[in-house]
Amino acid sequence: MSSYSAQLREEQQAVSRAYDRLDALRAQARSRLDTVRAAGSHGSPTQRTERDSFATMYEDRLTQLRAVEDRLVFGRLDDVHGAHRYIGRIGLSDEDHEPILTDWRADAARPFYEATPSNHGDIVMRRHITLSFREVVGVEDEVLDVHSDQVGEASSNGTLTGEGALLASLNAKRTGKMTDIVATIQGEQDRIIRADLNQAVVVQGGPGTGKTAVALHRAAYLLYTHRRALQRSGVLVVGPSSTFLHYIDQVLPSLGETGVVSRTIADLIPGIIATAHDDPYAAKLKGERRMAKAIANAVAARERVPSHLPVIRINGFNVPMVRADIEQAIADAKRTRQPHNKARETFVRDMLSAMRNRYVERLDYEPEQAELNDVMQQLRMNDDLRKTLNLAWLPMTGEWLVDQLFAKPQQLRRFAPWLEERDIETLTRPKGSPFTVSDVPLLDEAMELLGPDPKAVARQKALDAKRAEEEQFAKDTLAQAGIGSGIVTSQMLVDNINGMDAELTAQRAAADREWTYGHIVVDEAQELTAMDWRMLIRRCPSRSFTIVGDVAQTSALGGTRSWRRMMDPLFGERNCQLNELTINYRNPKEVSQLASDFASSEGLYISTVNAVRGVPDSVKRLTLRDDSLIGDAVAQQTVELVRAYVSSDGTGRVAIIAPDDMLKPLRARVYAQLQDELDPKEFDRLDAQSSWDEQVTVCSTQTVKGLEYDAVMVVQPGRIEENAPSRIVAASDLYVAMTRPTQRLLILRTKDDEKLLKL
């Protein structure tokens, strides 16, 4: 047996021990869960509730233990005393509480990511362990102390290496799902991951620098390190699209964390899912910070004295509504600093009191309380009074307010006086039009100023009253059972009564617009407008954020071109830590260089990025005589890329990125060619794939943000630039398109297209 084989065998024993312990913990949780479930519905309500609480705990534990199956162990640290410390996805100890595996997030695991030959403490060697399912198939050693005995041992064992584990992960075929990088986190990434919670951490990085991975691993680290603080408030992850969120949705579970809310800006408000998009200029206008003033003006305009004030007939007396009374009631309501709909309660109460007093002034006697009560009832039921009070202080929903604002040009002129006529024309749309993604922050602003819909408040009050009764019943039940504290609380019993015992913080947070999170992660953050940021800050008043993006990839006209210019007003310079990632782990050097040169020539800010590997012939150009040849050429080139990079096991991804007006015909032509040239079973497999998981996709520059493919074909880049709202946006879009591949970039264009853009 070779020395290398002996090392594999040694590590297999350690890995098997970790998996055996994992299996034992799973079996233990499963056994306890089965025991709890076997008890059924027998016993008192308290006993049933306690069993349900245990069942929930065991179910959650099983979910966590199942999620860490893949690559449970991936590293080992050797110290100067000869002790081994294994690093993995979660921490494991044996029955005697002796450590088997150290959680990658623990301080004891930091040297695995941060130790260097010049700063390694008592760690002399770092070992990377590669698994295939539960079998050890590779080990690689990095000796950190060149004077230690491990140098000679690693050399003779054939395990001495540097970046093998990293390069292997980079060269692997894409699966359509982002995988974690827990085994290959680099030093500059680890320092960001472990940054303090109570600040905004901004990560600027070019394509392929691992921004998304760093953000997600930071979320997992914070949940581990600040479990108590974040467990009740939760963590929100905001991504650029539902496709992107689907792409990353297995990363946090694989790190042992499942209680995270993932949303786009479009679906951040419960009950509203915006799918329509404004044209880029309209989106820019709606994203400006001063649109908050327009919403505030629109709300304030519904707090006024109506031009016509009726006379109300009460018990034979004419009681006029007086302007001074309305002005005073409005002032009193505003002084409460409550949202509009809530403050309206004060306004209405004051007006009813004022009208009652006006009635009393007309009497020549002191009325009894019964008469005053009757007067108040008549006032509440009077249609003229109700209509006038609504005109003076209109109850509204955010949806109604925003719909009115953009349906009536005169309102835009009045409430947003800085808008020019062409701006108003751009923003005006028919009443009842579907809400756009750019409307969502405006809706949120309106909802914040207005407060809940009064009808919804009434429904919630009824539910709260019912819940209070149930909680009192729960307390009485526990008291009768002699249980005042312990594993079961009255709150848990109430949740059981309502079937909510297994409801996670994440689920509750996602359903509550006013929920405040303990931390928010924002990916592709350069695309967010000032109004988007207002909406997010509202959801995390502590301003604990992880913000990742690349200002060179900004395609939104109202997006970020300078982090400091956007971030400092939000967080303050002292509370905003700006970091920059400099190593490109995705693109071959040839692709990275081409894309960077292009972006620089277009005036984009480019982070200093060094690609870690080269791939011969990774850039290919194909120029056609005219447009008539594009369809056939794209189809044939796609077939070649599919044969080279797409596998029947579901791995490998190819993207054809083209101008919007070419997408449908190109997709039809591509799939027709694939049907002609591929094995029928293979074509049927590809053709049956959902849009989430398809291995061959034809798409626009906007839909590939944050994603990566084995091979990318960019079709007619000059046309893509020509159709963009501005040259700088076009450059950003093309930069994004060119930096998606891990192996091959093909630029296919006509001679006329070459004249539009030098590339």
Description of each model-found segment:
Residues M1-V182, Q186-R191, K755:
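Extended, charged low-complexity regulatory segments
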Residues A324-H519, L528-W533:
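Conserved helicase NTPase catalytic core signature
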Residues K177, I181, K211-A215, M291, ...:
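Phosphate/oxyanion-binding active-site loops and adjacent basic polyanion-contact surfaces
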Residues R9, Q13, Q64, A168-A172, ...:
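Generic amphipathic alpha-helical segments used as scaffolds and interaction surfaces in large
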Residues Q186, D190-L197, A220, N390, ...:
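Amphipathic, well-packed alpha-helical segments that form the structural scaffold of globular domains
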Residues M1-S5, R9-R32, V36, G40, ...:
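P-loop NTPase Walker
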Residues D196-Q199, G205, R232-G234, H246-F415:
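Conserved ATP-dependent motor core of P-loop NTPases, especially the RecA-like helicase ATPase domain
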Residues R228, S233, S242-K286, M447-P454, ...:
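Conserved helicase motor core of SF1/SF2 NTP-dependent helicases
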